[in-house]
Amino acid sequence: KDINTIDLGAGNGKNELLNLTLQDVLDMGKKDGSGNINLTILGDSQDKVSFKDEIGKTWEKQANSVTENNKTFDVYTNSDSTVQVKVEDKISDGITS
């Protein structure tokens, strides 16, 4: 709980974070002063992250990526507008149903 960054590591082999649900992110994420959860996942091309859709709680990959600290991130949102997850673009990422 109270996590805002997960570092899967770079150059340390294949690490996977699979089937993340909205509840998983709500349970582990740290809320900011506005009550929003902004989770950042770092890693490299050997790593994999997937989000799991549930009834009424679907993930969406945003069309535009964002750049912070010279790193580019894919941005995922869910039906809960207070949640945003940024996944470093080198990581293999996607949504499962």
What are these regions (language model features)?
Residues 7-11, 42-44:
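Feature marks extracellular polysaccharide-active and adherence modules
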Residues 24-47:
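Short glycine-rich, basic-tinged beta-strand/loop micro-motifs
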